[in-house]
Amino acid sequence: MIIRSPEPEVKILVDRDPVKTSFEEWAKPGHFSRTIAKGPDTTTWIWNLHADAHDFDSHTSDLEEISRKVFSAHFGQLSIIFLWLSGMYFHGARFSNYEAWLSDPTHIGPSAQVVWPIVGQEILNGDVGGGFRGIQITSGFFQIWRASGITNELQLYCTAIGALIFAALMLFAGWFHYHKAAPKLAWFQDVESMLNHHLAGLLGLGSLSWAGHQVHVSLPINQFLNAGVDPKEIPLPHEFILNRDLLAQLYPSFAEGATPFFTLNWSKYAEFLTFRGGLDPVTGGLWLTDIAHHHLAIAILFLIAGHMYRTNWGIGHGLKDILEAHKGPFTGQGHKGLYEILTTSWHAQLSLNLAMLGSLTIVVAHHMYSMPPYPYLATDYGTQLSLFTHHMWIGGFLIVGAAAHAAIFMVRDYDPTTRYNDLLDRVLRHRDAIISHLNWACIFLGFHSFGLYIHNDTMSALGRPQDMFSDTAIQLQPVFAQWIQNTHALAPGATAPGATASTSLTWGGGDLVAVGGKVALLPIPLGTADFLVHHIHAFTIHVTVLILLKGVLFARSSRLIPDKANLGFRFPCDGPGRGGTCQVSAWDHVFLGLFWMYNAISVVIFHFSWKMQSDVWGSISDQGVVTHITGGNFAQSSITINGWLRDFLWAQASQVIQSYGSSLSAYGLFFLGAHFVWAFSLMFLFSGRGYWQELIESIVWAHNKLKVAPATQPRALSIVQGRAVGVTHYLLGGIATTWAFFLARIIAVG
């Protein structure tokens, strides 16, 4: 008798050839919807086509099919990202002054775009130094390339080609995993396995390989660059990787190889894995040895985290158990049922991810200037301002997106019959208390924060400076913020005994880092002016949250419309005969939330731009005297509304308004054009649908008279469509106006 070990059961996780590849179907607009596929009767058709093309919920109710479409779309997204990156690297290789910038980053500006002379627009090619004429870029790519050890344009070409290959690969993967081997629903819902791969694979091994690259390639190359060695003389990356003696000349402990690691004598590696804090005085960036150490530590943490969850072997945590154990004395059933929500509603899952990623993006914005990670980034003021502004906007949009998808989850995926007394149910049951308290907080913050400014404007207008809230009259010092600053400034040698400097120069301590006569960073003083504007931040953020949270908590029902869930995520009003029920859909809350998000982020980036020009950025003389760009006027000017208008908006707009005839003139045109786009939005936002329908009908009459009427009937935009077009142009116009204003200013004076 032969005893066989039991055959392992192989779980089949994919379906083969589930959907045939049909070019005929792809070529047919609206193939995903019976109604839209019929073709246009009226012009509303094109709007519905765009609104529903990616609303996979509306194509089918089969969760597996929806999951596959989302998964496939992700590969398409990655393909576009690789294509974009490839373009950036190609521009660096083909059209840029990267090699010149590398040899003298303090006197030469980064440029990767040279305008062709067609109608005289070669005026835009400004002199960026070193005899190169082009458009100055503010994306920070040059600084990243230097930090990663790229020393010539051939390397950029190779990376660009590599990214193109990856883009093609991603496109193929998107097709393959929808049409050839599509994962089953069980695969999408296997969260423990997903966590293992994402934590240990993406974040763990990703960080480890980046740390390895930094140690073996970036550090030695940057060491040579910092010492002033000509980039052409520096050995190439593969020489450092293959030849240990080369590295040992720079870092002697390399000669010992892995012995110190296995004998636990890790301090030997302290040459290239440091814990210094502060900035490298040569480049004004974080110490690259600190960054390598950081990525190694992060890699270890995530590799451990990736092994915490129970998959094929019966050990480790189960997500469902963790969530169901999560309850306290006041939280009823706690998170019971949350596991089922997050594995069956991708909107709920996406909502959490957007909220966290949005918050993280805003954290990134604040770290990019306070702990500038790349060499010569801190002294490139245009790039610093651009990176801060960009990450703030992106974070704001992601957080509004979180509320949007939370509301879609509530309308489409929430099942009240199966939820009782878990945390979500308890939040919904006392939503009135939450919203009314939040509303009170908004009113309090609004009146008090704005009231402080109005007081100051009034006192200033009446010529009574001694009665103003300011650092020289009635002081309102931000004592808690100053306490946090001091705690961090004193950390080295106290709470962080191993560090030689604090995490950021902004905390205080008197250090100043200047590179090539320009200030990289110095301690940022906070005073009454910051106290005032921070309360405006609190106000705008709370109002944004009020609108978005109300939209989520009242997405399914309200006293006004008890059956709101039946009307869907977006609807204009609750039908005829019910006046006063317009603008109550969850979609309308997202619409309104976007405007307040725009308010909130605008105040933040204005605060940052002016504060940095006034108190941080500037030049330093040989005697060590710092001259700031706006001479420290923030503390006294920004404490009145009039000061913001006069000394920030008007005074700093002079560069963009006077840019005609110079290399910055494109910003002047954009400033004008984007104002126009913004104003155009008001035509959609302050208009009634009937007005346009009447107008359209008389225009159609004229076309009929001339026998040129189209077969597709023109229709005025629906209320929701009009609002969507309006808010899009409002945000686009506002953001582009700000962009032109900031860049013309900072490129001219920075």
UniProtKB/Swiss-Prot annotation:
**UniProt-listed PROSITE patterns:** PHOTOSYSTEM_I_PSAAB
Q: Which Gene Ontology terms cover its molecular function?
A: 4 iron, 4 sulfur cluster binding; chlorophyll binding; electron transfer activity; magnesium ion binding; oxidoreductase activity
Function recorded in the entry? PsaA and PsaB bind P700, the primary electron donor of photosystem I (PSI), as well as the electron acceptors A0, A1 and FX. PSI is a plastocyanin-ferredoxin oxidoreductase, converting photonic excitation into a charge separation, which transfers an electron from the donor P700 chlorophyll pair to the spectroscopically characterized acceptors A0, A1, FX, FA and FB in turn. Oxidized P700 is reduced on the lumenal side of the thylakoid membrane by plastocyanin.
Q: How does it sit in the membrane?
A: Multi-pass membrane protein
| Binding-site residues, chlorophyll a | M683, Y691
Query: HAMAP family, alphabetically?
Result: PSI_PsaA
One Pfam family name is PsaA_PsaB
GO cellular component labels: chloroplast thylakoid membrane; photosystem I
Q: Where is the protein localized?
A: Plastid, Chloroplast thylakoid membrane
The alphabetized UniProt keywords are:
4Fe-4S, Chlorophyll, Chloroplast, Chromophore, Electron transport, Iron, Iron-sulfur, Magnesium, Membrane, Metal-binding, Oxidoreductase, Photosynthesis, Photosystem I, Plastid, Thylakoid, Transmembrane, Transmembrane helix, Transport
Would you identify the family this protein belongs to, as annotated?
Belongs to the PsaA/PsaB family.
Q: How does it assemble?
A: The PsaA/B heterodimer binds the P700 chlorophyll special pair and subsequent electron acceptors. PSI consists of a core antenna complex that captures photons, and an electron transfer chain that converts photonic excitation into a charge separation. The eukaryotic PSI reaction center is composed of at least 11 subunits.
In the record, biological process GO terms are: photosynthesis
Co-factor remark: P700 is a chlorophyll a/chlorophyll a' dimer, A0 is one or more chlorophyll a, A1 is one or both phylloquinones and FX is a shared 4Fe-4S iron-sulfur center.
Q: Which residues make up the binding site for chlorophyll a'?
A: H675
Reactions that this protein is recorded to catalyse: reduced [plastocyanin] + hnu + oxidized [2Fe-2S]-[ferredoxin] = oxidized [plastocyanin] + reduced [2Fe-2S]-[ferredoxin]
EC number, as in UniProt? 1.97.1.12
Q: Where does phylloquinone bind?
A: W692
Task: Write out the transmembrane intervals.
Answer: 70-93, 156-179, 195-219, 291-309, 346-369, 385-411, 433-455, 531-549, 589-610, 664-686, 724-744
* Signal sequence region: none
**Name this protein carries in UniProt:** Photosystem I P700 chlorophyll a apoprotein A1
